Design a protein with these regions (language model features):
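Glycine-rich Rossmann NAD(P)(H)-binding loop
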Residues: 132-136, 162-178, 202-210, 232-234, ...
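NAD(P)-dependent short-chain dehydrogenase/reductase
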Residues: 86, 113-187, 191-192, 218-220
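Catalytic helix-loop patch of NAD(P)-dependent Rossmann-fold dehydrogenases
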Residues: 52, 56-60, 67, 71, ...
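Short, conserved SAM-binding/catalytic segment
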Residues: 3-11
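Residue-level signal for the nucleotide or nucleotide-sugar donor/cofactor binding architecture
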Residues: 53-56, 102, 141-145, 178-184, ...
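Amphipathic terminal alpha-helices
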Residues: 251, 263-276
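NAD(P)H-binding glycine-rich loop region in Rossmannoid oxidoreductase-like domains
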Residues: 7, 16-53
Length: 276
């Protein structure tokens, strides 16, 4: 993670444990918070840790921002939508009915619900990121996008491994679909909220659901190497917690941003050829 700071310009680095002491007396110096901090491991089972780290800490920071009239932009997640049976609309009216599949998604959902219950969705910006991929994700380990590991394994073993379908009646092997969105687009959209006054919860995705097979073929095309696709069983700790389908409803986002997303094939090629 620290490698991502090399070559970057910043005024200070403050531990999350020291942040509120550091903030004391600096209310007039801060223009906005972009709060991305969280444990994003969808297989994390320590509920107390997730509640404290992802939920309570975010509540504390949001309360500080609201009290001091500071713009607060935070990362929610597409994981809050669960299996997608209730759709992927970012309309506030549907928040209460969402059922995340894992504790990570629930910890994010809890803050969305808190903001709604406290009546502050008109004072904060929640961005529900879908399947983000791109440069500087190596520190995320297993929770990074599959692209770096696919490239490494493809070049080493000549194959890319995709999960077999857990719902063969709905999806073929590799036919599960996700809304993949390039981190460069995500960064641009996130920063755009620093320059407008819009508030509420917004989906951040491409609005297109691509199959894993399609992603794999984009990788094969970018590496320009003979790579085969192999289907493997899903790890037991992911069964029942894995989203087989995501697609962002981006109508609301399109009202505040031009939302010109990089096509998947172009984004994958840029990532692989320029960063991996």
């Amino acid at each position: 993670k620290w490698k991502n700071l090399v070559g970057k310009s910043f005024d200070d680095i403050v531990s999350k444990y020291d942040l509120f002491d550091w903030l004391e007396g600096r209310e007039d110096e801060i223009g906005a918070f972009i709060h991305m901090g969280a444990c994003s491991d969808t297989t994390e089972t320590d509920a107390d840790y997730l509640l404290e780290n992802n939920y309570h800490y975010t509540v504390d920071l949001a309360e500080y921002a609201i009290e001091n009239d500071i713009r607060f932009i935070y990362a929610s997640s597409a994981a809050t939508y669960g299996d997608g049976e209730k759709g992927f609309s970012d309309d506030h009216e549907g928040l209460l009915g969402l059922e995340p599949l894992n504790m990570y998604g629930y910890s994010k959902h809890l803050f969305d619900l808190w903001a709604q219950k406290q009546g502050v969705l008109d004072k904060v910006v929640g961005l529900k990121y879908f399947n983000v991929f791109g440069p500087n994700e190596g520190h995320k380990g297993r929770m990074a996008s599959v692209i770096p590991s696919f490239v490494k394994k493809g070049l080493k073993d000549g194959k890319i491994c995709l999960f077999k379908s857990s719902e063969p009646e709905k999806y073929s092997d590799g036919g599960q679909k996700r809304d993949f969105v390039y981190v460069k687009d995500v960064a641009r959209i996130t920063c755009s909220f620093l320059n407008n006054t819009e508030c509420g919860i917004f989906n951040v995705g491409s609005g297109i659901a691509h199959t894993w097979n399609s992603l794999a073929h984009s990788i094969v095309s970018a590496v320009d190497f003979d790579v085969k696709i192999e289907y493997i069983d899903m790890p037991k700790d992911l069964i029942g917690k894995y989203q087989n389908y995501t697609r962002a409803d981006i109508e609301k986002l399109q009202g505040v941003d031009d939302n010109t997303m990089t096509p998947l094939k172009d984004a994958v090629e840029d990532y692989i050829k320029n960063y991996l």
